[in-house]
């Protein structure tokens, strides 16, 4: 379940 959250956080950080 944290997989999706981690992916989202990474996307936001990169942005």
From Swiss-Prot:
Keywords, sorted A to Z: Cytoplasm, Methanogenesis, Nickel, Transferase
Cofactor requirement: coenzyme F430
Subunit structure: MCR from M.thermophila is a heterotrimer composed of an alpha, a beta, and a gamma subunit.
Pathway note: One-carbon metabolism; methyl-coenzyme M reduction; methane from methyl-coenzyme M: step 1/1
Superkingdom, taxonomy of origin: Archaea
Entry function: Component of the methyl-coenzyme M reductase (MCR) I that catalyzes the reductive cleavage of methyl-coenzyme M (CoM-S-CH3 or 2-(methylthio)ethanesulfonate) using coenzyme B (CoB or 7-mercaptoheptanoylthreonine phosphate) as reductant which results in the production of methane and the mixed heterodisulfide of CoB and CoM (CoM-S-S-CoB). This is the final step in methanogenesis.
Activity-pH dependence: Optimum pH is 7.0.
Family that this chain belongs to: Belongs to the methyl-coenzyme M reductase alpha subunit family.
EC numbers: 2.8.4.1
Reaction catalyzed: coenzyme B + methyl-coenzyme M = methane + coenzyme M-coenzyme B heterodisulfide
Compartment annotation: Cytoplasm
Name recorded for this polypeptide: Methyl-coenzyme M reductase subunit alpha
GO cellular component: cytoplasm
Keyword DNA-binding listed: no
Note describing how the cofactor binds: Binds 1 coenzyme F430 non-covalently per MCR heterotrimeric complex. Coenzyme F430 is a yellow nickel porphinoid. Methyl-coenzyme-M reductase is activated when the enzyme-bound coenzyme F430 is reduced, probably to the Ni(I) oxidation state.
Thermal characteristics: Optimum temperature is 60 degrees Celsius.
Principal location: cytoplasm
GO molecular function: coenzyme-B sulfoethylthiotransferase activity
GO terms, biological process: methanogenesis
């Amino acid at each position: 379940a944290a997989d999706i959250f981690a992916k989202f956080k990474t996307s936001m950080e990169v942005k």
